[in-house]
């Protein structure tokens, strides 16, 4: 099965997301998918809170005249803005944009709050819906008209040094987040022609999907003083002088959820990282005539033992065990524990890992400790497998002065191995013309195994 077909199929069958809403590019998070989203963003919120960010919430509606202040920035997506033009039947004097991103709203308010150097640094974030009139082919959780989960952080600082340090903190924070949810990444400094409009520079996280295309999963932007000058974000320095603040912003969206689904899944269905799994352990009673009560009493006891540490579900449906196995493998539940009369007699339980399919017999009396060990192995294995999978998609090519010859080799490699091609840096190929020659994207400058490369790939 092709990856795109697998992806659409699994979102529906595993109860992640329903596309049947009557607006292109808009869908519904189903309960199981919403829980994956919730646990993922809880990790992100914790990382942000621990590094001094404060969560807030800004309006969705932006007056046209305020949005226009963004100048260069708004040019990057002015054709994608949704507009509210009427209140009931009455035309509005000023059109209102549905938030495409929040620089305008947040920086307008920051101007009200930042007056002197003691008001800095200011580190805010929100998790909100954003809207883009996507005209390209939309994909669930990947390319949407309503992005339902957009985490955007915006910070303001007194000095360039503090601003640069914030970029490093943001990169470290995002590394920790993607490591936690088991999504491998390659970090690139985006080229000038592909950076965030209005930024000094952009750093981006990309992962590689099973079809060999790359997906941008996170971005970190150093805005310098560019937006501060537009929005007159001035403050009084310790010397009594006036200066503009230095700013950063960084975002992660539903693509993080799409990626943890895509990177780990297999022919049986989802393989969910433990920390974001709605159900971490499913218990399956193996019932035999005359032994039902013994098994159910024991497995309920096991449920009570485990639920103090894990999210556990006891599947007591009146259907065959094999169907239960298939259902929970499809949903990617990390561990399955089977318990039958013979297991109880022998003082054992059988644990089955979703990532490897390995069946492990453990002592029932020591089951909590055994489960904790297996969960730890599951986490490490999932991370290593994903990293190895991504590494297998990376090809390093030597630079050649003959750009046409090099471009043909790049195209051949992209067809053969797909993924990311790394080429030693040379100015002659670091341009949009080279993108056209290779019919792919220049992701930017990437450090790989201690060396700097130009990274190119086919992207979503």
UniProtKB/Swiss-Prot annotation:
Disulfide bonds: none annotated. It is an enzyme of class 6 (ligase). Keywords: Aminoacyl-tRNA synthetase, ATP-binding, Cytoplasm, Ligase, Nucleotide-binding, Protein biosynthesis. It is found in: Cytoplasm. GO terms for molecular function: ATP binding; proline-tRNA ligase activity. Its EC number is 6.1.1.15. GO terms for cellular component: aminoacyl-tRNA synthetase multienzyme complex; cytoplasm. It catalyses: tRNA(Pro) + L-proline + ATP = L-prolyl-tRNA(Pro) + AMP + diphosphate. InterPro entries: aa-tRNA-synt_IIb (IPR002314), aa-tRNA-synth_II (IPR006195), aa-tRNA-synth_II/BPL/LPL (IPR045864), Anticodon-bd (IPR004154), Anticodon-bd_dom_sf (IPR036621), Pro-tRNA-ligase_IIa (IPR002316), Pro-tRNA-ligase_IIa_arc-type (IPR004499), Pro-tRNA_synth_II (IPR017449). One of its GO terms (biological process) is prolyl-tRNA aminoacylation. Homodimer. Belongs to the class-II aminoacyl-tRNA synthetase family. ProS type 3 subfamily. Catalyzes the attachment of proline to tRNA(Pro) in a two-step reaction: proline is first activated by ATP to form Pro-AMP and then transferred to the acceptor end of tRNA(Pro). Consists of three domains: the N-terminal catalytic domain, the anticodon-binding domain and the C-terminal extension. This is Proline--tRNA ligase.
């Amino acid at each position: 099965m092709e990856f795109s077909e697998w992806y659409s199929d699994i979102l529906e069958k595993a109860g992640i997301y329903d596309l049947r809403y009557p607006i292109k590019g808009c869908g519904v998070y189903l309960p199981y998918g919403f829980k994956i989203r919730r646990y993922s963003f809880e990790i992100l919120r914790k990382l942000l809170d621990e590094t001094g960010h404060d969560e807030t919430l800004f309006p969705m509606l932006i007056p046209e005249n305020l949005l226009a202040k963004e100048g260069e920035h708004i040019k990057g997506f002015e054709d994608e803005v949704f507009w509210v033009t009427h209140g009931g039947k009455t035309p509005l004097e000023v059109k209102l944009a549905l938030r495409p991103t929040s620089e305008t709203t947040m920086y307008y308010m920051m101007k009200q709050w930042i007056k002197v150097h003691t008001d800095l640094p200011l580190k805010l974030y929100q998790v909100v819906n954003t809207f883009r009139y996507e005209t390209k082919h939309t994909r669930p959780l990947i390319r949407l008209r309503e992005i339902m989960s957009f985490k955007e952080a915006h910070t303001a600082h007194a000095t360039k040094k503090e601003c640069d340090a914030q970029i490093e903190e943001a990169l470290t924070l995002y590394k920790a987040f993607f490591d936690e949810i088991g999504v491998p990444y390659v970090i690139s400094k985006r080229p000038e022609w592909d950076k965030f409009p209005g930024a000094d520079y952009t750093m981006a996280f990309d992962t590689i999907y099973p079809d060999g295309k790359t997906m941008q999963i996170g971005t970190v932007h150093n805005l310098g003083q560019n937006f501060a000058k537009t929005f007159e974000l001035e403050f009084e320095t310790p010397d009594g002088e006036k200066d503009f603040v230095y700013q950063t912003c960084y975002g992660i969206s539903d693509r993080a959820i799409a990626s943890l689904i895509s990177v780990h899944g297999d022919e049986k269905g989802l393989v969910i990282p433990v920390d974001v799994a709605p159900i971490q352990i499913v218990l399956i009673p193996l019932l035999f005539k005359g032994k039902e009560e013994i098994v159910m009493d024991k497995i309920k006891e096991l449920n009570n033992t485990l639920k103090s540490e894990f999210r556990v579900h006891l599947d007591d449906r009146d259907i065959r065990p094999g169907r239960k196995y298939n259902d929970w493998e499809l949903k990617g539940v990390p561990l399955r524990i089977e318990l039958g009369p013979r297991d109880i007699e022998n003082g054992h339980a059988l644990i089955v890992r979703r990532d490897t399919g390995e069946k492990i017999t453990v002592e029932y009396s020591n089951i909590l400790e055994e489960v904790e060990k297996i969960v730890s192995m599951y986490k490490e294995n999932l991370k290593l497998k994903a990293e190895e999978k991504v590494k297998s998609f990376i090809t390093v090519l030597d630079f050649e002065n003959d750009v046409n010859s090099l471009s043909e080799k790049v195209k051949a490699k992209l067809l053969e191995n797909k993924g990311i091609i790394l080429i030693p840096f040379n100015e002659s190929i670091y341009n949009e013309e080279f993108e056209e020659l290779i019919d792919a994207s220049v992701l930017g400058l990437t450090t790989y195994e201690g060396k700097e490369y130009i990274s190119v790939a086919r992207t979503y």
